[in-house]
Amino acid sequence: MPSKKKKIVVIGRSNLQNLYIHTVLLKKLPAEIYLVDDQSKTSVQDFNYASYYHADATIHAGTFNECRNADIVVFFQEEMSNALFSKEDNVTLIKDKVKKMMATGFGGIVLVATAESNVVAALIKRFSGLPANQIITLGTMLATSYFQVEIAQLFKISPKNVHGYIIGDNAEDVIPVWSRAFLGGKPILSYLAEEQKRITAENLQNLTKMITKIPDFPFENKDGCTFRYSTVTVLAELTEVILRDEARVLTVGVEVKEAYGLESPVFISVPAVIGAEGVRELLELNLSDDEQKELKQIATKTTEKLEILQLNKGGIS
């Protein structure tokens, strides 16, 4: 008997929408995908012309009403990357979308695919009343996978045998957790003392600098590159992990309440078990003192951004 199709609703406008849907189609997920955007009809028709080649999934134009029984809502907002669009206007737009989404009785998972995603996730939680485990951002999922690949290349082994994490927020506010990085079961830092021909402190420093240059969200650089493919690849992967209930450990943006010594709840990227219900379990790493200090500083930055928005709006409840 064929499995019931899952339902994905894409709300908000972004130049990533179509590429994200295309990447999901390549995964052959049995899904109904709805685009809630007044300019989506052309995109939907384009996908439907090729429907012979993606029979597992169907694509439709829709309204916010489609959120009522959606498994996942993917939340885009290109205005977050637009310098001409004020922070206050962005908050108003987020609130409007969330209220429309929740008015349908939505109770699924929200994937936040915007710039400043941890701030947006906190706003979505506040405006929606959804449990924190049902709101997830891309966090440092891309940076972590790239980190593992680069280490694998240094040691000339498979990335599948590298266990390491990038945590924090995005852009420069990320932390390579060297104290918890392993090749198989062997700590990578042990190679600095035992096998400096294979890896040096300079190698680690260069890799750390490289990781901070990974864009947190697509932007256009001087060559016109918007770094879209890497973003939608991890977004589609996260979608698959949830819809297939894979219970995988991913470094994504989740609300941390008491772990890591943080003083108040904040969305930040750390390892968590992700499945059909969203965040199944938070995995608290045993960080070094320096890593712990850096994480607290990053969490404070996110909290301060939310406080500024609250002051500017006279309260954002």
Where do the protein language model's features map onto the residues?
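C-terminal substrate-binding/catalytic lobe of Rossmann-fold NAD(P)-dependent dehydrogenases
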Residues: 128-134, 143-317
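Conserved N-terminal Rossmann-fold NAD(P) cofactor-binding segment
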Residues: 3, 32-70, 308-310
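Structured loop/turn residues at beta-strand edges in well-structured enzyme cores
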Residues: 28, 68, 130
